[in-house]
């Protein structure tokens, strides 16, 4: 399989830590994404590494027994260590605070601590087999204050740091889940919900395993993912992932079912809002996108993998350290190893090899694996780093070898402009709210974020269309049809078309002598009026004489002042067009000769300068009986320039009757 076929990869620079062994215990904290390597209970050192840490944190602590759990508070201010089932020890890592350990025992009698979670830099939750205890840590006093507690029988727990929600498994079957949400010193109990277990043989008692549950944020919403190894319907084979949506308000609801169509050992990750399901037996993974259209049965949506199953891209472990000799080749990493442990959203840890990776999605290979361009666009537009890939898809579908049909091209343009319009509307609403002074009264008002899915006209023009029209092998009718399709799409979404797109159409029509089509486009207002467009038409007069009148009509429709039209034309170096225009409206006797001579000189076209100079000499002769310029016209430097280029004899002689 070529590299172009793998759509999942492990990050290039993993976090490296000391491998797990009888002396070295490895722990992972999913809130800070840190790996702790604890040697000999901490007596011979603890090394903490995170994905962004340039410098790992190293320290020692007394060996007071086996470490069950170890985590820093957010911002690494306070260390918490659990060594017994009754207590958690704390140590401050704040400058000027005492480094002496202090201890907190769980409040509930006869309860055993299952674990703990930091919810902020000074707030911590103990989860016991009899409930949950929420504390504030007071580092300067070296003590804890109980903020709130709740009693219930707990089998196991799970924490989602992104949304600060803890899920507790209760009841004998372990399948009733009780969520709690934490925020700034408050603990809120959310409605509990039941996970539907698959039907099991009478002899075995079904129960919900912690291994089969994950929590993750997908498209900004919190979901509980349940890996159901057997479908609830007996006629369906294979496992499935059931997604329960857990809102901040209201009850949890089953929303999506991801069909795996296979059985065996699975693991889940979430990357770039995609659910990734790894299958150990086949050593492959599949991805699901819940935003793509699925099959809706009235209550849940069923989804199939977006793409065929593929392995994660083979990974070479880089050789580092003193043993790294140039002749040694990198060691291939065993993918889908039984020692792999996955954490949400996108983390894979190999404790036996001493690596922590982030899983990543590669978009380029997906382009060739998803032939349906409409579905491909729906998929790509939801991805974080999609812009350049989408532009390459657009270029590809307009290439000679992979040319798409016009209806497909239209669909792609419509999908792009749908996103573009959404962003423009959001920007406009924000601007209006700011203007109305709502930003002060509503602190929640945020400027819309421009994601990579917003491809505006300049992106499409620069990266796709301008190169496309240059292709000599393309039939010109197809080129024009594509340009018009993009303009149609912009109009359909009520997006003002930028003049450079109209210019591209006109230049292409002129290049192929399709003047009748140009005339029709202008006559029926397929091309919107604009000053730059009118100037372009004026410049085409020598190829297509009616362009002059079409241009003037357009400028009149735009209620443009005549002197403004002249200024626009001169700024575009359309000196002859400006002169023709001013003659056409009978204003040529009053115009400034100097302004026109300046513009003609700037073009560095000597023959153009000659023509303009001669025109004004003739005007002077007609109006004043002499071709010479008066001192008030300030044309001395132009007369000198004319003499320098063409000689004195080229000046007009006064004619006498």
UniProtKB/Swiss-Prot annotation:
Tell me which residues make up the Mic1 domain: 471-637
Q: Name one GO cellular component term.
A: lysosomal membrane
Q: Which UniProt keywords apply?
A: Autophagy, Endosome, Lysosome, Membrane
The record's section on InterPro entries has: RMC1, RMC1_C, RMC1_N, WD40/YVTN_repeat-like_dom_sf, WD40_repeat_dom_sf
**Looking at the keywords, is Hydrolase present?**
no
One GO process term, biological-process aspect: autophagy
Q: Which Gene3D superfamilies match?
A: YVTN repeat-like/Quinoprotein amine dehydrogenase
Which Pfam families has this protein been placed in? RMC1_C (PF07035), RMC1_N (PF21029)
Compartments annotated for it: namely: Lysosome membrane; Late endosome membrane
Please tell me whether the keyword Membrane is annotated for this protein.
Answer: yes
- Where is this protein primarily located? membrane
The text of the family note is:
Belongs to the RMC1 family.
Q: What does this protein do?
A: Component of the CCZ1-MON1 RAB7A guanine exchange factor (GEF). Acts as a positive regulator of CCZ1-MON1A/B function necessary for endosomal/autophagic flux and efficient RAB7A localization.
Subunit field text: Found in a complex with RMC1, CCZ1 MON1A and MON1B.
Name-wise, this protein is: Regulator of MON1-CCZ1 complex
Lineage, opening ranks: Eukaryota, Metazoa, Chordata, Craniata, Vertebrata
- State which gene encodes it: RMC1
């Amino acid at each position: 399989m070529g590299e172009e076929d793998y759509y999942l990869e492990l990050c290039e620079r993993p976090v490296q830590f000391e491998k797990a062994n009888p002396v070295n215990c490895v722990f992972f904290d999913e809130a800070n994404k840190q790996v702790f390597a604890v040697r000999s209970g901490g007596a011979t050192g603890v090394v903490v590494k995170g994905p962004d840490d340039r410098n790992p944190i190293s320290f020692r602590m007394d060996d007071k027994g086996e470490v069950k759990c170890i985590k820093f508070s957010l911002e690494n201010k306070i260390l918490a260590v659990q060594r017994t089932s009754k207590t958690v020890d704390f140590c401050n890592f704040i400058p000027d605070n005492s480094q002496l350990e202090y201890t907190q025992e769980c409040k509930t009698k006869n309860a055993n601590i299952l674990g703990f979670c930091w919810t902020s830099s000074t707030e911590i939750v103990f989860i016991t087999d009899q409930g949950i205890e929420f504390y504030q840590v007071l580092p300067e006093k070296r003590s804890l204050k109980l903020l709130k507690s709740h009693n219930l029988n707990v089998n196991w727990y799970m924490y989602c740091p992104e949304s600060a929600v803890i899920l507790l498994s209760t009841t004998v079957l372990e399948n009733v889940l009780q969520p709690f949400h934490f925020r700034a010193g408050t603990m809120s109990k959310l409605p509990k919900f039941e996970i539907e277990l698959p039907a099991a043989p009478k002899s075995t008692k079904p129960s919900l395993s912690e291994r089969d549950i994950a929590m993750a944020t997908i498209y900004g919403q919190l979901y509980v993912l349940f890996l159901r190894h057997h479908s609830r319907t007996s006629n369906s084979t294979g496992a499935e992932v059931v997604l329960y949506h857990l809102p901040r308000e209201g009850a949890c609801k089953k929303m999506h079912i991801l069909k795996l169509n296979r059985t065996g050992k699975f693991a889940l990750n979430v990357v770039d809002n995609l659910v990734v399901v790894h299958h150990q037996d086949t050593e492959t993974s599949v991805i699901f996108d819940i935003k793509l259209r699925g099959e809706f049965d009235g209550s849940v949506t069923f989804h199939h993998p977006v793409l065929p199953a593929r392995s994660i891209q083979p990974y070479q472990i880089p050789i580092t350290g003193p043993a790294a000799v140039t002749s040694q080749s990198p060691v291939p990493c065993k993918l889908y190893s039984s020692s792999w442990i996955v954490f949400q959203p996108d983390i894979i840890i190999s404790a036996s090899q001493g690596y922590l990776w982030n899983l990543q999605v590669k978009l380029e290979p997906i382009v060739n694996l998803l032939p349906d361009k409409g579905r491909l666009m729906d998929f790509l537009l939801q991805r974080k780093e999609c812009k350049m890939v989408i532009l390459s898809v657009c270029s590809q579908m307009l290439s000679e070898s992979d040319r798409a049909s016009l209806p497909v091209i239209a669909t792609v343009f419509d999908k792009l402009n749908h996103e573009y319009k959404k962003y423009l509307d959001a920007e406009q609403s924000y601007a209006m709210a700011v203007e109305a002074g709502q930003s002060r009264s509503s602190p929640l008002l945020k400027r819309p974020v421009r994601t990579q899915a917003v491809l505006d006209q300049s992106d499409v023009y620069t990266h796709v269309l301008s190169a496309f029209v240059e292709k000599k092998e393309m039939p010109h009718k197809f080129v024009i049809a594509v340009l018009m399709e993009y303009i149609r799409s912009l109009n359909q979404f009520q997006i003002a078309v930028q003049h450079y797109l109209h210019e591209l159409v006109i230049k292409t029509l002129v290049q192929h002598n399709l003047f009748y089509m140009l005339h029709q486009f202008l006559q029926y207002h397929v091309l919107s009026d604009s000053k730059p467009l009118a100037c372009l038409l004026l410049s085409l007069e020598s190829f297509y004489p009616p362009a002059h009148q079409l241009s003037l009509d357009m400028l009149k429709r735009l209620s443009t002042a005549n002197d403004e039209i002249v200024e626009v034309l001169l700024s575009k170096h359309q000196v002859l067009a400006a002169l023709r225009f001013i003659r056409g409206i009978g204003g040529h006797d009053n115009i400034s000769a100097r302004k026109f001579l300046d513009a003609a000189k700037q073009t560095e076209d000597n023959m153009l300068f000659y023509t303009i100079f001669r025109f004004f000499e003739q005007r002077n002769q007609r109006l004043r009986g002499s071709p010479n310029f008066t001192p008030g016209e300030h044309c001395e430097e132009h007369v000198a320039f004319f003499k320098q280029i063409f000689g004195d004899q080229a000046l007009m002689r006064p004619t006498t009757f």
